[in-house]
């Protein structure tokens, strides 16, 4: 438990980095503290829970649940917060990624890999650290679509990026470059459907610039997602575009069903 004034909350949390859940029992008269603590949690990948007597201090819709005999308030309803839903989604991911990796991917790898090696010096696969579930970094796989360069981990690819190879441009436009991420799915680092993972430098930047950006990391990143089928994909020239992507990702978190995943997959690959 945290013992002290609300003013010292952020300092306390910066020292005690192992905490994941914050329970707030401030009165409604202290609403400004509720809002401050709530925003801190949203932007630092922490679960916020409010004890019922503070419900009037929240400026937004809230959800209630029970921890033992104690009712608590949550900032959103998350279907994947339930163990049975996470198990269902994981079984779905293993089944589809396993079938794809055994039946289709070997032929894709042979053909695409041969063309990559023939047209551009360097490895077939591009490996990059991305931000995943709960803010944990992981190695994300892609077919290499660019010339080997020193800006891969810092500079976002653009439509007319001179680093792209001719074949790489086709890979990116067709999304074939993303297919090795089914390896990440099978390993449990990603899901077939979820928020797209971003490079570490972009996570650091957007976490400061976009409110609630880190919320999207409460679930596994995906090969495709709700944001992508609604036009939020590829290069983000303006901050508002990334803001729209984050809103779409959070909507997906709050409305997940296995049927929604099936719909997103059908739209993405047809």
Question: What is the role of each PLM region?
Answer:
Residues 80, 84, 88, 92, ...:
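Alpha-helical membrane-protein architecture signal
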Residues 5, 68, 80, 84, ...:
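Residue-level signature of the cytosolic catalytic core of signaling kinases
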Residues 158-220, 264-268:
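A short, structured surface patch at a secondary-structure boundary
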Residues 1-102:
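N-terminal hydrophobic signal-anchor/signal peptide
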Residues 84-149, 184, 258-268:
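A hydrophobic, helix-centered structural microdomain
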Residues 212-269:
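C-terminal terminal-structure detector
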